[in-house]
From Swiss-Prot:
Induction: Induced by L-lactate but not by a racemic mixture of DL-lactate. Makes part of the larR(MN)QO operon. It is a multi-pass membrane protein. GO terms for biological process: nickel cation transport. It comes from Lactiplantibacillus plantarum (strain ATCC BAA-793 / NCIMB 8826 / WCFS1) (Lactobacillus plantarum). The gene is larQ. This is Nickel permease LarQ.
């Protein structure tokens, strides 16, 4: 009797491929935060070009003084006419911006105003809608001036302005290191989130507790970076003081750029008396 050959054919129901439609779900906790972090890192890697708002270059310290004068004046003034004139001054400065930079200014300014209004909102129940609108107007003007300065001033000019105003070297060094290593810490946070996503097999039960652990790890990493950087700077002979380079001489155009803020301050002083 010959041995029978076993039947090795695969059944037909195993050969048919069935595709199960997967319902569209919302973005997960990891993916959503990683997308926002990648967008932030791309902006830090390729910052937007600074807009030239005038035909001559104003000294960095004069631009910084103008910003401080306007912000302090907005904080001290309670006159609606004076605040309206300051709003017109900012509006006239915005007219010199290109359309692309103006759209970027409006987007960042509206987001910052919306976040600031969350802190001003309790005044509605304490003092009424009039106080809320008044403080909202002052906060919006402060943020508009700060946003305009950020849009038209590179970071190196900010450091040069602080040096020209004789700010402490420790403050300038801390600010420069913080901006320089911000992208490095962001990349470390992104890599940590990707590693946790690969090791996570279930939905995150406590996302806010996990966020606290991530930022705690980020703080320890920044502390390690700071110690390594300080040791490297000491090895290269840094003694905590910057060599002050000879800056350019002040010109009458610098004082002319500062004149609108001075005129508004004079009106504010004489209006009160």
């Amino acid at each position: 009797m010959k041995p029978t050959r076993p039947n090795t054919d695969i059944p037909a129901w195993l050969q048919t491929t069935t595709t199960t439609p997967t319902p569209a779900i919302k973005a997960k906790f990891w993916q959503r935060n990683q997308r926002h972090l990648r967008q932030l890192l791309s902006r830090l890697a390729q910052p937007a070009p600074v807009t030239a708002t005038s035909h001559w270059r104003v000294a960095p310290q004069f631009k910084l003084i103008q910003l401080l004068l306007l912000v302090i004046l907005i904080a001290l003034s309670n006159n609606l006419i004076l605040l309206w004139s300051l709003a017109l001054l900012v509006g006239c400065q915005l007219l010199w911006l290109p359309p692309r930079q103006l759209r970027r200014f409006m987007g960042s300014w509206l987001i910052s105003v919306g976040m600031a209004m969350l802190f001003v909102l309790p005044s509605y129940w304490l003092a009424g809608p009039t106080t809320l609108l008044f403080f909202g107007l002052k906060t919006s003007l402060m943020l508009a001036n700060a946003q305009y300065y950020r849009l038209t001033t590179p970071f190196q000019d900010l450091l040069a302005g602080l040096k020209a105003l004789h700010c402490p070297d420790l403050l300038i060094m801390t600010l420069a290191i913080a901006i320089t290593y911000l992208r490095m810490l962001g990349q470390h946070l992104l890599l940590t989130m990707e590693a946790l996503e690969l090791r996570t097999v279930a939905p995150t039960a406590h996302p806010y507790r996990l966020i606290g652990a991530l930022f705690g790890n980020l703080y320890l990493k920044s502390y390690t970076y700071a110690l390594e950087l300080y040791a490297a700077m000491e090895a290269r002979g840094f003694n905590g003081h910057y060599v002050r380079s000879t800056g350019r001489r002040t010109h009458w155009r610098d004082y002319l750029a500062l004149s609108p803020a001075i005129i508004v301050w004079i009106l504010f002083i004489f209006w009160r008396h």
